[in-house]
Amino acid sequence: MRSIILLLVCLFSICLKAQTEFRVYQKESKKSWYYISAPINGTKLNDILITTGDAGFYIKEHDFNELFPDHSFAKSKLKVRSIECFRKKYLVKNIFVGKFNVGNVCFVGNIFVLENSYPFTAKLDVQNLCNFSDSTKNVINLNFAEQKLAFVDMNAVDTTKLSKFDILSVYPSIVIKVPITIRQDGKMWNLEGNMRLYLSNAELIEFYPSKYLDEFCKQTKVKLIDVYDDYLDSYKAIRYDKLKIGTKYFPNHFIPIMKNFSIKNSFGSINGSFFKGNFYIDLKKNKLYYE
């Protein structure tokens, strides 16, 4: 009988923990700062500071064992670390791990949070993601409806469950990580790097950096931009006019930039949000679709 009562108590405790809810908010005095509040085991913890910068959001280091005395963080994944994507560093909050949905879009993997980087405004219902102790997993509801935050591990996107949607309704440019072959004076140059498309006017692309970039610019006398201020990093870039792309440097059977085109199995980013999969670019409508 005692064991049955203990079992019921444990189940009830788990149900209470399953109601854990995180909230992200700002204060009037500090508009650039964000905070998290969370009720844990009946105790509401406020003002867990998140700092924000060009790289996005991350939790400032706290003594989590002091904040959550009923939980052990010795073996949990509450560590803030830095990753590098496209030569930019982004801070990863490795607190949530698992699978979640935004509308019809399903992501699997770690979550990192970037400011205003994803054109979804939705409440994310996250299940079995947060490991507050060595043995307990809680169900957490995250409501970022006002903040427009993004969460995706670029190496763990389940592209089979992605529906087509317009991602340039908010942002006019995209960075795509692709290998590109350029024909110039009878030679072929394989440039492996990142390509930035400005689709609002479809006039320029920049391609940077690559194994052969310096040599390519030296021999072809293509203009090389020495410093490009992208908040987090400076890099070298080639800048082309669209006519040159269509006629000389990018023949149609490589990148038909004057027409709509698709890019398969590529990485892409839109203002910091990273995607892996297929892109379809409609230059007439100035739209880009992620398939």
Where are these regions (language model features)?
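Bacterial Sec-dependent N-terminal signal peptides
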Residues: 1-22
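Pepsin/retropepsin-fold aspartyl endopeptidases
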Residues: 19-291
